[in-house]
Every structure is written in C-alpha cells, then in structure tokens.
Amino acid sequence: MKDRLIIVSPRQYGYQTDYLKYVEYLSEKYRVVFICLNQGEKKFECDKAEIKYLKLAGKRSSYLWFMIYTFVYITFHSGKVMTTNFSGCRYLKKILPWRKMVVNIRTVSVYKDSSKAAAQNERIRKDALGFDRIIMISKGGAEQLKLPMKKVDIVGLGADVISDTPKTYDSLRLLYVGTMNHRDIPKTIRGFHQYLLASDDSEATYDIIGDGDEFQEIRDYVTANNLSNRIIIHGRKRYNELKPYFDKCNIGVAFVPINEAYRHQPPTKTYEYINSGLYAIATRNQVHEETVHKDSGILINDTTEEFCDALKKIRQTKIDDTLVRNGGIPYLWRTIVMDELATSLEKI
C-alpha cells in the first residue's frame, strides 16, 4: 500500500500546471489526495488521484469551509501534507503541529508597488516559517524572502514536450500562454504590430492564450488597428487544450517586466516553449539569463522596440528546432518532480 500524500490548494485542480504534473508523477510513489475549491471551472478527469472539490459559496464562507474541511481531513487521515502558499496557510501547521507538513512557494510578490510587494513577501515569509520544510522555486527567491535556507529545498519549474511537430521559421507564428496580470503583454502586441508594418512577413500571426487585467486593453488595440486576422485572442485554455497552438506556432513569448519582483521568477511556459521547438523571446531576468541560450532563444529588455527588433533578428537567423529542443532537456517535468520534489517530501 502506498503512503498517502495530501495536497492542499484553494485553486481548483487542473488550472495550475505545476500541480497537474505533481499529481501525474507523484502518483507513482504516493496515494495522492488533492483538496481544492470548486471555482466553477470545467473539472479535469483524473484517475491518478482522489480530487476533493469543495463547493464555492461566498468568499469568506468558502475559505472558512475549506479550512475546516482540510483540518478535519488531515486530523483523521495519515500521510504527508503539502500545501500551496495561500494567505493563512500557516494555521494548518499551527492547529495541527504534530503533522509533518511542507509549504510550496511558487512565486514571490509581483506587485509593482514596492510597499505592497514588501508587505506580501513578509506575509509569505511568516506563513512559511512554521512548516517543517519549505519548497521554493529558486534560491534567489528564497533569499529575497529571507527564508532559513536549512529548511529550504529548491524545486524549479518543469515542462513537457507538448508538441513534437517539426518547426520551420520562415514566417513567424508567435504564441503567448499565461496570465495577463502585471506582465506588460500590450508591449508585445505593439511590438508585433510594428514588425508587421516594417516586414514582408505576410503570414505572421500572434496567438494569445490567457486572461487578466490586460486582456481588455489588448482586445481594444487589436480591434482599433484591424489586427484580428493577425493577432488571435483565445482567452483561457486548459493545459490539455494547448497542443494545437504549440503545433502551429514556432516562437514562444516569455515576456515579464524586468524588475525586482520578477528577477528570480521564470514564466512557467518558457521551458514548454523550448521543449516543443518554439524559439523563445525572453526578457532579460536572472533566471532567463541562466536558461535561455542562443540556440533556444533571444534575450531582450522589456520594451516594445526591443520586442520588434527581436522579431526582425529572428527572421534573419538560421534556427534549428532540434537545438531549440535540446535546451529544454534539463527541465522535463519527470526530472523535476521525481528528482527534486520527491526528494524534498522524503525529508518530512
């Protein structure tokens, strides 16, 4: 009989790639139970774990019900506990101090306002300190939060090969997948528009998948400039719906602002782009400088002008999709989960 692993996350199962992959691979080693809120999204079919959906009501009552249910379940069921970092997660460990638990922090604060960022980072730090182990996305992020390194294990981001379709790069077909909160994606829209005006690339397209605060600004720009046949806005898609877009496209947009908030934070999709043969346009943060090389992508500053210039350079560059894919081999999800995450869980 496998040992039980209880994963706690207010976010509905299936809409965080990391946790989809954790369940997929950790189920080989553990009997996984995933406790989450039902946020009204379409449910993922899952035969590798027991998914416990808790009905979403009002914000406060849902959170309270989520916490009560989780306390009761953990109390009466043995097994290791891994929780996502969410506001108040510290109380799981405070109320059940005898249970071995690890908290998994996937991001530091990304607020542009420095005082808000500092306050959120301090909340994340305080929530994490009481746990037996702390999983962090990068060493730089752990240092930024001033976490005790003796309790920290680094578990990076991973990627699967979403598409094995051979790529050519004669015409540029861009893809952005991710959030549109605080990412400055409108800069890439304007940069792509400038590229279209200056280029003879008559078949260039830009597919955008995701949602967030910038969504309406992007839609308005596309409409105002009659770009709907070149810039296609798809809204939110589930992970298992992404393959046709990775098959179609050959350039992956890994664009985050260059500031303290994102200095140690890789966009989740960067590695998926590279592993699927999409040459990456990546903003020049510390993590991208360590992982995106000349055979797999181009590094830029976070401006409209440099985004446009990068597209022009890519069009003139001879790119080999085999070399692009080779750059992503160290970041395959199986390696990340079974070598890094499973090792961390064995410590509790």
Predicted regions and their residues:
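Nucleotide-activated donor-binding/catalytic signature segment of Leloir-type glycosyltransferases, i.e.
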Residues: R219-K243
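A short, active-site helix/loop in glycosyltransferases that binds the activated sugar's phosphate group
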Residues: N38, Y91-L92, E122-V152, A159-V161, ...
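Short His-centered aromatic/hydrophobic patch
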Residues: M82-G88, I105-R106
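Conserved acidic donor-binding segment of nucleotide-sugar-dependent glycosyltransferases
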Residues: K294-E305, K312-K318
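A charged, aromatic-enriched C-terminal amphipathic alpha-helix characteristic of glycosyltransferases
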Residues: D302, R315-I348
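Nucleotide-sugar-dependent
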Residues: Y13, R183, N240-L242, A254-E272, ...
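Membrane-proximal helix-turn-helix segments that form the acceptor-binding/catalytic region
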Residues: E24, M67-F76, V103, S115-M136
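Conserved donor-binding/catalytic core segment of Leloir-type glycosyltransferases
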Residues: L5-V8, I135, T165-L196, D207
